[in-house]
């Protein structure tokens, strides 16, 4: 708490006040500040002090009325005691009346982001005038505000404070650090002093008529003039001289803690005297640790020194250019300087309401521009020439608007703005606004399109297959679009075809490009397929990342009334592409933010998701309106591709406007094919091995590929696989650099050298049997994970208690494993269903004793990996089988897994993510998979990507060829289940072969 308190545990309370009326002031310890306030904004603060009896007789408050104090009492006895303790340590500077309690207050800078650090200051003088009160504060210590309040404006509040005691921290430093800090401060101070002296000397020489010609450029620099005004004022000279004298006294003393503390205190004085930026002073004030403050001080002063270095470099550069320039170039340079001065004087004249000052400004303007007739003429000629060129360019653009097919509203608006622009002078406030507007509008490529060459479907297919493996659904949709364009091309070029049925405008509407939404897990090729499509179509490609967009103006643009307004991302993409028919990829469309908590963002910034509704609607985007452009722009020729990882983040209206194409994760075989055909050659080229001709070809064996795909990566995409392949190739590069020789083959045993050890085999660990556990009650379900992959989800059920009272209203099931509400409901449904079928005697071989034991027992159901949240209805069949397994005490094969929602009647309903779940079953080495019968079409689509083949498989129900194809690909034997008894039949085939009794058991 500081060394001066009565006891280490005593609390300090001081009133806190934010310097709203002095927003650029940063109070630093050791410095006195004289601040003028408007009477209404500060009078209540002083009245609050006078209301307390301890300050009532303070002579500084003689003219203050207590009736204007705040309703809440801020200055109480705790504040009085704290003021006394502060004055005990810091009030030894000739106080006029030691009997008076001095007023201390914590001053907080207005511009600070964090108002928890301020300066404890003593009020030393108060001057009251009519509408103004001027207060002198003497800042004495840096303190931490323990109870910061925001938006207090001119209000005063009491807070518990903590002195930031530099002396205590200094005691923890060793002698070496003390000595180093002293030497560092002394060097920085004297280096700065020398730089300031040299600058003043150069400037004084440049300001004299008899001075060096080369030094006169320094006198032209606005930076040099500003620095000289700041560093040559009487206040700066006096303060700097005192600091220098005090430093000379300290340097002769012994280098100990006390000397170092005095130098540390001088840092605050130096930061307040030198012309530092507001941010630098704020950072310096709020730095609590002395060591970090010392580093910040060194950085700030060195930055200040660099200003003079850059100033000297700029002067040397101008002198070198000036010495090699012709007289005409020199005249132009001086003319530009004079013209800038004239503009500045004109601004002063406009802002000055005094007639006398206006006349003086006019006289100064005449004197400045009249000495050299040539300079004046040259300046005017250059200005007029530039202005004429601008006008000609804009006029040419305005005249060609109809040819460029600009919307009629746009033609009217641009012509009107151009007329206003022609009447303005460059000094007009709106001149530059309109100039920037015309620059942006002229960049929009109205009427410019990239002509698509003759469409060859075979070459297009080959190009897509060359760039991407799989993704048949995207390729199929693109081929359909190319075929439509091909028909249009044929109908246009063949005079024998009847084009009256489809006039030109109708054909244009038929050829509207599709708006495709590619949904899939990360790394499956959504973004890269869009680039390939642009290459196939011969269109310019532009990518817009929508992640984190939270403002409608970023899509639609800012209105021109705002300072620094710009067009939106869509118009910006057209400007970059230089054509009206590019392919624009809206990446991560599901990450668009749609407002803050409680819809606040929608009210303030607009909804960027809603702004996309017009962009992605083929019926509306022909008249897309950007706020900055101000008139409709035709986007109907743009081919929009959108990507997303999850449909949940996309609103229904937006989703309805796009064609949805789902990209599932890759199978291990597909990953191996992509890795060998695409990724490995790409990494070899990226790491430079392709340039070395004598090297053997690098390849991975089949075992190595399987190991990399199955053990070193766990993802639906191939980004992680590419990183692993890159690590292998870089390892080969290291071997070549060290040995000048490498082996081309990479087998499974060599992988550890490049990739380290494989991931922990969690699949084997979870599914492995335990020594003392029961074999029954364990069933493998299937899950679709949030990253787009599938996996086996284990359900464990054990009996933990039996009710000896014989109550048969159970069983009671406790659940763990971070389960969601829907999964909890599935457990309740499964429990009721198993009770129902046992009660009706639908399972043969179950006696009354087993039923009673089941109904009177308590069970515990757990799903491993509790850190992962789990939810959804698709585990109903697996949970029912696990509970039935416990009731019958029959184990389930650990190589069997299943998925499907169950109803109270035992019906197995269809679920989603079939392909991903089958991949997960393959990854976990399952043999048999049970899926709902209604998922037949999903299974067919998982084993085949060709439409014709899918139809043939789907219609052949007698042979069910999809089962054999799946087994050939994944070694999985799939069974369809219509109801729960199909599940029981495939799980325990021998059980249902017994005679089924339908009589109700007697309980």
Swiss-Prot record:
Polar residues bias locations: 368-377
The record's GO molecular-function terms, alphabetically, read: ATP binding; ATP hydrolysis activity; ATP-dependent peptidase activity; serine-type endopeptidase activity
Region named Disordered: 367-389
* Key words, A-Z: ATP-binding, Hydrolase, Nucleotide-binding, Peroxisome, Protease, Serine protease
Ranges of residues in domain Lon N-terminal: 14-305
Record SMART domains:
AAA (SM00382)
Q: What is its EC number?
A: 3.4.21.53
**Which residues are in the Lon proteolytic domain?**
773-969
Tell me the residue numbers annotated for binding ATP. 520-527
**Top EC class per UniProt?**
hydrolase
Q: Can you supply a Gene Ontology BP term from the record?
A: protein processing
Chief location of this protein within or outside the cell: other
Naming one, the record's GO cellular component terms include: peroxisomal matrix
State the protein's name.
Lon protease homolog 2, peroxisomal
List the catalytic activities from the record.
Hydrolysis of proteins in presence of ATP
Q: Which organism is it from?
A: Kluyveromyces lactis (strain ATCC 8585 / CBS 2359 / DSM 70799 / NBRC 1267 / NRRL Y-1140 / WM37)
- Localization per Swiss-Prot or TrEMBL: Peroxisome matrix
- The keyword Hydrolase appears for this protein: yes
Per the record, the similarity remark reads: Belongs to the peptidase S16 family.
Q: What does this protein do?
A: ATP-dependent serine protease that mediates the selective degradation of misfolded and unassembled polypeptides in the peroxisomal matrix. Necessary for type 2 peroxisome targeting signal (PTS2)-containing protein processing and facilitates peroxisome matrix protein import.
In terms of InterPro entries, this protein maps to: AAA+_ATPase, ATPase_AAA_core, Lon_lid, Lon_proteolytic, Lon_Prtase, Lon_prtase_N, Lonp2_euk, P-loop_NTPase
Q: Which residues form the active site?
A: 874, 917
């Amino acid at each position: 708490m500081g060394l001066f308190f009565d006891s280490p545990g005593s609390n300090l309370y001081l009133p806190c006040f934010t310097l709203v009326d002095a927003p650029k002031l940063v109070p630093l310890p050791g410095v006195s500040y004289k601040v003028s306030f408007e009477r209404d904004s500060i009078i209540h603060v002083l009245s609050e002090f006078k209301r307390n009896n301890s300050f009532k007789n303070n002579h500084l408050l003689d003219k203050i009325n207590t009736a204007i104090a705040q309703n809440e009492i801020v200055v109480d006895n705790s504040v009085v005691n704290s003021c006394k303790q502060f004055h005990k340590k810091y009030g030894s500077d000739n106080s006029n009346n030691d009997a008076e309690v001095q007023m201390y207050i914590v001053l907080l800078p207005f511009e600070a982001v964090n108002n928890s650090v301020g300066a404890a200051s003593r009020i030393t003088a108060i001057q009251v005038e009519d509408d103004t009160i001027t207060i002198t504060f003497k800042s004495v210590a840096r303190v931490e505000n323990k109870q910061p309040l925001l938006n207090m404006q001119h209000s005063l509040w009491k807070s518990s404070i903590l002195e930031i005691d530099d002396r205590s921290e200094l005691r923890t430093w060793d002698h070496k650090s003390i000595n180093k800090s002293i030497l560092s401060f002394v060097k920085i101070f004297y280096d700065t002093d020398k730089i300031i002296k040299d600058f003043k000397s150069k400037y004084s020489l440049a300001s004299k008529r008899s001075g060096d010609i080369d030094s006169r450029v320094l006198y032209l620099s606005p930076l040099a003039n500003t620095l000289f005004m700041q560093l040559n004022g009487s206040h700066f000279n006096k303060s700097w001289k005192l600091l220098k004298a005090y430093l000379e006294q300290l340097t002769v003393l012994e280098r100990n803690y006390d000397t170092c503390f005095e130098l540390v205190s001088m840092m605050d004085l130096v930061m307040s005297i030198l012309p530092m930026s507001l941010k630098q002073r704020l950072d310096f004030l709020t730095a609590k640790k002395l060591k970090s403050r010392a580093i910040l001080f060194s950085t700030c002063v060195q930055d200040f020194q660099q200003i003079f270095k850059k100033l000297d470099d700029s002067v040397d550069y101008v002198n070198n250019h000036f010495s090699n320039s012709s007289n005409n170039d020199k005249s132009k340079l001086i003319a530009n300087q004079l013209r800038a001065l004239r503009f500045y004087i004109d601004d002063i004249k406009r802002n000055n309401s005094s007639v006398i000052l206006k006349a003086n400004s006019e006289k100064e303007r005449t004197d400045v521009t009249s000495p050299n007739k040539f300079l004046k003429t040259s300046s005017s000629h250059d200005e007029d020439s530039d202005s004429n060129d601008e006008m000609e360019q804009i006029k040419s653009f305005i005249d060609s608007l109809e040819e460029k097919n600009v919307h009629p509203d746009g033609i009217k608006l641009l012509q009107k703005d151009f007329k206003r622009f022609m009447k303005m002078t460059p000094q007009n406030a709106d001149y530059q606004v309109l100039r920037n507007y015309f620059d942006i509008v002229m960049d929009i490529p109205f009427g410019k399109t990239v002509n698509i060459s003759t469409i060859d479907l075979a070459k297009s297919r080959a190009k897509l297959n060359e760039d991407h493996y799989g993704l048949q659904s995207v390729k199929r949709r693109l081929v359909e679009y190319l075929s439509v364009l091909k028909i249009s091309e044929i109908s246009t070029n063949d005079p024998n075809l009847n084009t009256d049925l489809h006039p030109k405008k109708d054909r244009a509407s038929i050829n509207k490009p599709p708006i495709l939404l590619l949904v899939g897990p990360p790394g499956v090729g959504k973004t890269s397929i869009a680039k390939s499509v642009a290459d196939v179509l011969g269109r310019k490609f532009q990518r817009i990342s929508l992640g984190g967009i939270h403002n409608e103006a970023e899509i639609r643009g800012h209105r021109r009334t705002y300072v620094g307004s710009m067009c939106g991302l869509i118009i910006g993409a057209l400007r970059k592409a230089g054509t009206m028919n590019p392919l624009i990829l809206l990446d991560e469309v599901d990450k668009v933010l749609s407002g803050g908590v409680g819809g606040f963002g929608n009210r303030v910034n607009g909804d960027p998701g809603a702004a996309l509704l017009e962009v992605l609607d083929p019926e509306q985007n022909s008249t897309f309106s950007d706020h900055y452009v101000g008139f409709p722009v035709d986007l109907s020729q743009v081919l929009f591709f959108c990507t997303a990882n999850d449909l949940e983040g996309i609103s229904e209206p937006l989703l309805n406007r796009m064609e949805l194409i789902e990209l599932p994760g890759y199978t291990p075989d597909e990953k191996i094919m992509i890795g060998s055909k695409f990724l490995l050659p790409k990494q070899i080229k990226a790491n430079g091995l392709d340039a070395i001709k004598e090297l053997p070809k690098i390849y991975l064996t089949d075992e190595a590929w399987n190991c990399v795909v199955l053990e070193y990566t766990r993802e639906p995409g191939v980004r992680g696989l590419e990183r692993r392949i890159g690590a292998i190739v870089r390892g080969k590069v290291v071997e070549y650099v060290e040995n000048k020789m490498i082996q081309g083959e990479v087998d499974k045993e060599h992988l550890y050298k490049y990739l380290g050890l494989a991931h922990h085999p969690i699949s084997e660990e979870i599914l492995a049997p335990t020594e003392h556990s029961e074999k029954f009650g364990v069933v493998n379900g299937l899950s679709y994970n949030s990253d787009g992959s599938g996996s086996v989800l284990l359900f464990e059920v054990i009996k933990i208690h039996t009710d000896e009272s014989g109550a048969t209203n159970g069983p009671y099931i406790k659940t763990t494993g971070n389960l969601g509400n829907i999964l909890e409901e599935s457990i309740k449904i499964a429990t009721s269903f198993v009770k129902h079928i046992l009660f009706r005697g639908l399972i043969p071989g179950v006696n009354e004793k087993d039923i009673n034991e089941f109904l009177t027992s308590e069970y515990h159901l757990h799903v491993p990996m509790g850190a992962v949240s789990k939810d959804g209805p698709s585990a109903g069949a697996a949970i029912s089988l696990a509970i039935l397994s416990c009731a019958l005490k029959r184990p389930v094969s650990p190589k069997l897994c299943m998925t499907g929602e169950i109803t109270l009647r035992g019906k197995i309903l269809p679920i989603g993510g079939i392909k991903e779940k089958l991949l997960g079953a393959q990854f976990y080495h399952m043999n048999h998979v049970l899926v709902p019968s209604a998922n037949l079409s999903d299974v067919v689509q998982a084993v085949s990507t060709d439409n014709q083949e899918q139809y043939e498989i789907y219609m052949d129900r007698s042979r069910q060829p999809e089962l054999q194809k799946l087994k050939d690909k994944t070694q999985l034997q799939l069974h369809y289940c219509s109801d729960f008894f199909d599940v029981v039949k495939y799980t325990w085939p021998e059980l249902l072969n017994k005679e089924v009794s339908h009589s109700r058991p007697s309980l």
